[in-house]
Curated annotation (Swiss-Prot):
The keyword Metal-binding does not apply. Residues 626-635 have a biased composition (Pro residues). This is Pre-mRNA-splicing factor cwc22. It comes from Emericella nidulans (strain FGSC A4 / ATCC 38163 / CBS 112.46 / NRRL 194 / M139). The lineage of its organism: Eukaryota, Fungi, Dikarya, Ascomycota, Pezizomycotina. Residues 667-677, 813-824, 855-868 have a biased composition (Basic residues). Belongs to the CWC22 family. Residues 391-411 have a biased composition (Acidic residues). Disulfide bonds: none annotated. The keyword RNA-binding does not apply.
Length: 868
């Protein structure tokens, strides 16, 4: 009982209002019964109607408490009004602080918290304008993340060219971690879009290599982890992305080779399947860039196919891979044409190995406060201007700008179509032509031409039209030369264009007829003589037989004649010997090859400008002599050199024969002599010398077995042969011998032979006769002296070496003439002279008529010294 009393005393009973009591009498609101231990009976609540009417007049509110509550409410209202009044001067700062606090609270709130409408969030963000605050930077970071993620999700083949500039508009240096995470996530979710993501990454890598390097690092780390965990899906996505980056040359193909060798080192069904997929994507690029690596990979596949214990499905995949390789990857090109957006020289290739120590820089994925945020943003704005151009900062994405850009693109397309029809070019040429033809003098013409607005890139049309109009005239008009001179001296641009025109017209001068060629040459002659063009333009001329045509030689001739007419020959020679311009004239006066040097000398001499080649002649005279090869043995057959420059040698012979004679007379000579004579001479000569002559006769091969005499003798021969001989007696000891009998010491020949060569010293005469020779000859010419044997171009020597002897000719002259290098033979021989051997005499007679006029004396060639 005591407990119950304590319990009752512990309860605070409120004071009843006046006129009311808490007695156990029934009340209108609730009935209470005294505590009883017996269970209470089921009682119904009495209807409240009667009690409510009874208590309606009783007041329930304490007036004092009501007054107190009213007073407190008024006090709170007054305090609130005072606070509001005191808060007005610091509105902005407090708004900023309140907005920051609320934004921070919202960002840190767990997911599932209070929903914030976008309009309220934007209004809240608009209130935060302090760029140095952490809240503003966090807000910008969130916007950057959403923008990069949205652009990557929108990209496809058709719009990649438009998405990439927008992507560069975002700060990819600050958000490179966000970019890499977003593009890797998008690629793993949609593998068919991997080439598009790789192309986007390749474009970004050309301008921001650190972004491409970070992407590669994360892909390699991702592959390593997935390979260790046997995560096939992640391995496939990582290797596919790396393969396409390798195709785009963002990463070196060595990385793909390392991954393939790792996968095939211990082949399993999954690893071989991943390797097959990687090879199909990167195989074409591997074979183009690293053939040995591709061969090693396919050899490994072949070994796995034949030896490894793998599933039938994987074996079939390897066989399909070999078929793809056989088809040259026609269904798996390295780069599709529409995604080949990066020039090869612009791409930056990273060399990262599979086993290198790599940092993924995961801290770039989360927000960090940047104290120098504004400076970094300004730096990226400059970089963006360099990447996209200066006008990219002011671009707006409104519909009006889109419409205007569409209109501009349509106008550009129309312009392209118009340009391709060459209508503008034809109109421009017509305008220039009419302007030139309607002008009275060159000054008026230049003034009108300067007013013509030339489109960009069509400036060369003006010099071209001036030269074309000049070439169309019947005779050269100085009017055009003055126009060209004026333009070339007005601006360096026109001077360069005329220099380019000179090179172009010289290369194509063979297309013009002679009259047009003459006008063009005189036009450029005027330009050079007035120094409107630099003389270095003559460096395009290479004066030699191979690089010139008849038209170009005529052009050079007329050009130099015009220069000589304007400048005078002394001044022209002075200009040609100018030390500063000498390198430009190396093509006109070549010193690299004696043949080209002679060609230049002969050319300028023939056109009347031999004075310009004096230094070239001196150079040719002093140039080192060619080495003469050693003489072969006397009995060995030798073939002398053939040279093509026979016209410059004293002993050059041009003779033509009509009757070849073949002699089969026996002789005891040690050689079978063959002579080829082109002589057509009618001569009467009494030559008392047995000479071994070397002749260029008219291809009358003869086989003579008559012995060659070794003693002094006097032979009288009377030959009559129709031959024209320009050959001079020469002493050559090299020939082609075929000896069959020793030569006799004396011989007396008496033959009628058709000889086409004059007698010579130093060589064995190649004569052709069919009968034993007994000849009685009348000699009117003294024997020639030993002429220096020269090796000439385009000459054939097939005579054996022999000894030259003096002969005592029976001549009609009262005294012996002085020895000379050339002999004049006018002999009429009806029989060849008999030659006597040591033991027997051979006779052969062959009818011949060989009138030979005296050869003309030619100057010694400076390139071939005489041999003694």
């Amino acid at each position: 009982m005591s407990d119950s009393v304590v319990l009752q005393s512990a309860v605070r009973v409120p004071t009843p209002p006046p006129g009311a009591s808490y007695s156990p009498q029934p009340s209108g609101s609730r009935k209470r019964s005294p505590p009883s231990r017996s269970p209470s009976p089921n009682r119904r609540r009495s209807p409240p109607g009667d009690t409510a009417d009874a208590d309606r007049d009783v007041p329930r509110i304490d007036p004092e408490r009501a007054i107190e509550r009213e007073r407190q409410l008024a006090e709170r209202v007054r305090q609130y009004e005072q606070q509001e009044a005191a808060r007005k001067p610091l509105t902005e700062e407090e708004k900023q602080a309140a907005a920051k606090a609320e934004y921070e609270k919202l960002l840190n709130m767990r997911s599932g918290g209070t929903y914030i409408p976008p309009a309220r969030l934007r209004a809240l963000q608009a209130q935060i304008t302090d760029k140095t605050s952490k809240e503003y930077q966090r807000m910008a970071w969130e916007a950057l993340k959403k923008s990069i993620n949205g652009l990557i999700n929108k990209v496809n083949v058709s719009n990649i060219k438009y998405i990439v500039p927008e992507l560069f508009g975002e700060n990819l240096v600050r958000g490179r971690g966000l970019f890499c995470r977003s593009i890797m996530k998008a690629q793993a979710a949609s593998l068919p879009f991997t080439p598009i993501y790789a192309a986007m990454a390749a474009i970004v890598n050309t301008k921001l290599p650190q972004v491409g390097e970070l992407l590669l690092s994360r892909l390699i780390i991702q592959f390593r982890k997935a390979f260790k965990r046997n995560d096939k899906a992640v391995c496939i996505s990582s290797t596919t992305f790396i393969a396409h980056l390798c195709n785009q040359q963002v990463v070196h193909e060595m990385l793909a080779a390392q991954i393939l060798l790792l996968l095939l080192h211990k082949p399993t069904d999954d690893s071989v399947e991943i390797a097959v997929g990687l090879t199909r994507e990167v195989g074409q690029h591997l074979e183009e860039m690293s053939g040995p690596i591709a061969l090693a990979v396919f050899d490994q596949f072949r070994n796995i196919l034949h030896e490894a214990d793998i599933d039938k499905r994987v074996q079939y995949m390897i066989e399909v891979l070999f078929q793809v390789r056989k088809d040259r990857y026609k269904d798996n090109p390295a780069i599709k044409e529409e995604l080949d957006l990066v020039e090869e020289e612009d791409q930056i290739t990273h060399r990262i190995g599979l086993d290198d120590e790599i940092e993924t820089q995961d801290g770039l994925n989360i927000f960090k406060y940047d104290p120098q945020w504004e400076e970094h943003e300004e730096a990226y704005k400059k970089l963006k201007a360099e990447i996209l151009g200066e006008g990219s900062d002011d671009e707006d994405e409104s519909g009006e700008d889109d419409e205007s850009s569409d209109e501009e693109s349509e106008e550009e397309r129309q312009m392209d179509i118009k340009d391709q029809s060459n209508t503008d070019l034809v109109n421009l040429r017509r305008t220039i032509y009419l302007t030139i033809m309607s002008s009275i003098d060159f000054e008026e013409c230049c003034h009108k031409l300067m007013k013509i607005s030339l489109p960009a890139g069509l400036e060369p049309e003006l010099p071209s039209m001036i030269i074309e109009c000049c070439s169309q005239e019947r005779t050269y008009s100085k009017f055009y030369g003055l126009i060209g001179e004026r333009f070339a001296k007005i601006n360096r641009l026109w001077s360069d264009l005329f220099e380019n025109a000179f090179a172009k017209y010289y290369d194509t001068i063979h297309r013009y007829e002679t009259n047009r060629l003459r006008n063009i040459a005189r036009f450029f002659g005027h330009m050079l003589s007035t120094d409107a063009l630099g003389w270095h333009v003559l460096s395009v001329i290479h004066l030699n037989e191979e690089e010139t045509t008849s038209s170009s030689r005529i052009f050079i001739k007329i050009l130099f004649q015009d220069l000589a007419e304007h400048l005078g020959l002394p001044k022209l020679r002075e200009r040609m010997t100018d030390e500063l311009l000498r390198p430009s004239f190396e093509g006109l006066f070549p010193t690299d090859n004696p043949r080209n040097t002679r060609f230049s000398i002969n050319y300028f001499t023939s056109i009347g400008f031999g004075v310009l080649t004096e230094e070239l002649r001196e150079f040719l005279k002093n140039m080192p002599k060619p080495e003469v090869p050693a003489l072969p043995p006397a009995r060995s057959p030798s073939v002398s050199s053939r040279s093509s420059y026979s016209s410059r040698s004293r002993s050059s012979s041009y003779s033509y024969s009509r009757s070849p004679s073949y002699s089969r007379s026996p002789s005891r000579s040690r050689s079978r002599r063959r002579s080829i004579s082109r002589g057509r001479s009618y001569s009467r000569s009494v030559s008392g010398s047995s000479r071994r002559s070397y002749t260029r006769s008219s291809y009358t091969p003869s086989r003579s077995r008559s012995p060659a005499p070794r003693s002094r003798r006097r032979s009288v021969s009377y030959s009559r042969s129709l031959s024209r001989s320009r050959s001079s007696p020469r002493r050559t000891r090299r020939g082609r011998t075929d000896s069959r009998s020793p030569p006799p010491r004396r011989s007396l020949s008496r033959s009628v032979s058709r000889s086409l060569t004059p007698p010579r010293r130093g060589g064995r005469a190649r004569s052709y006769s069919r009968s034993p020779s007994r000849s009685l000859s009348r000699s009117v010419s003294p024997p020639p002296r030993r002429a220096s044997a020269r090796r000439r171009y385009s000459s054939e020597s097939i005579s054996p070496p022999g000894r030259a002897r003096r002969s005592i000719p029976g001549s009609r002259s009262p005294r012996r003439p002085p020895p000379s290098r050339r002999a004049r033979n006018y002999s009429v021989s009806r029989s060849p002279s008999p030659r006597y051997g040591r033991n027997q005499r051979r006779r052969n007679s062959s009818p011949s008529r060989s009138p030979s006029p005296p050869p003309r004396r030619r100057p010694r060639s400076p390139s071939t010294p005489p041999r003694r």
